[in-house]
Amino acid sequence: MNIIVVGLSHKTAPVEVRERVAFSPNLIERPLRELVSLDDISEGVIVSTCNRVEIYATTHDIAGGTARIKRFLADHHRIPLESLEQYLYSYHSEAAIRHVFRVASSLDSMVVGEPQILGQIKTAYGYAAEYRTSGTILNRFLHKAFSVAKRVRTETRIASSAVSVAFAAVELARKILGDLSGKTVMLIGAGEMCELAAKHFLTSGARGLLVANRTFAKGERLAAEFGGEAIPFEELFQELHRADIVLSSTGAPHTIIAPRDVEAVVKRRKFKPMFFIDIAVPRDIDPRVNDLESAYLFTVDDLQEIVEANMAQRNQEASKGEEIVEQEIGQFHCWLSSLESTPTIVALRARFEEIRRAELEKTLCGWKDLSPEAEKRLEIMTLSIMNKLLHTPTAVLKRAGQGGRTDLYTDALRQLFDLQTSRQDDDELELELEEE
């Protein structure tokens, strides 16, 4: 059985294509069931995020299974395959294992180290488990991917530094002001960057949030979302003294805060330090504000330097993550390869059990006066003999499977014992393999 991956991501497809191929979580049951109804696709999981759509599946026919999944994606979203195929990638066997381990560990993300992708894969797996489209192999595979991601996150510093301008602003504020607990933040503007900054500041312990925006209703909505207070834009300078941290991101064509404005506010605050972050382009705050006593001004360029330095650190840590992924690939691939011998082991045990049962019944028929206790002892003895005889060939077959050398042994056993094997795995034996 082989693991295959078919998908597209921010690296191969523009957003216009990704949004057309996305799956809605509210409507995921039908495509999951359609996926595993494809010829020779026995298990399937669909991962759909803003940056990637990927299908993880198991098949005996790598080329055929891959082609059928590509056709499934095109047909389901009503896109001509010849238009879609240029954006698709596919992996199988060890390359598929490596890819999913890297994706789960956020080594393949647009922002290396971001934590969202692991949760998104867990959610996708949850749907597959709920609708029973994942089985022994993908269950084991994805749980392994989750543990690999955990190793990467705990054994490296891949997620320890800010790589967004909004989070860099919080990191910088912490360095200047120390503990942010009890600090009040004022946002000038109500766009996406201000929203991200609000999340990060409040998560870092900031006490209060003030929002000043030219369109009061929009500022009011943002303030309400985070339990803050909206300030009419024309009252900005009357309320500025309440803020310890001011982040400005408007679309104004000129500066809106001059040194004289801040000088008056600082005096009113009795020269208690104020931290200004100007991430607007063109700038919102006159750079001469930085010359004032107790006023600290940083621009988007200052933050970008932090982001770039932290990104370089993350990339360095990512190389450690890649080493962890490579270590884990070998272990999982050994387990997957060992499943190739499962049908032969199942058939061999069944043949021995058939013979044991037949011979035991013949023996018991000849001993009419045998007590129930004696019959039980004979049952245990014959079962023990059978298990001891099968122990070595079973162990050899498992080791051969882990080394990718199953054919020689399985073919010999099938011929020697006239075994009829099927592709359906024995549940108990697979459980035994999983526990190893």
From Swiss-Prot:
Known pathway: Porphyrin-containing compound metabolism; protoporphyrin-IX biosynthesis; 5-aminolevulinate from L-glutamyl-tRNA(Glu): step 1/2
Domain of life: Bacteria
MF terms (GO), sorted A to Z: glutamyl-tRNA reductase activity; NADP binding
Catalysed reaction equations from the record: (S)-4-amino-5-oxopentanoate + tRNA(Glu) + NADP(+) = L-glutamyl-tRNA(Glu) + NADPH + H(+)
List of residues binding NADP(+): 189-194
Keywords noted in UniProt: NADP, Oxidoreductase, Porphyrin biosynthesis
Family note: Belongs to the glutamyl-tRNA reductase family.
Record comment regarding domains: Possesses an unusual extended V-shaped dimeric structure with each monomer consisting of three distinct domains arranged along a curved 'spinal' alpha-helix. The N-terminal catalytic domain specifically recognizes the glutamate moiety of the substrate. The second domain is the NADPH-binding domain, and the third C-terminal domain is responsible for dimerization.
Any further remark recorded for this protein: During catalysis, the active site Cys acts as a nucleophile attacking the alpha-carbonyl group of tRNA-bound glutamate with the formation of a thioester intermediate between enzyme and glutamate, and the concomitant release of tRNA(Glu). The thioester intermediate is finally reduced by direct hydride transfer from NADPH, to form the product GSA.
Summary of subunit composition and partner proteins: Homodimer.
Name of the protein in question: Glutamyl-tRNA reductase
Gene responsible for this protein: hemA
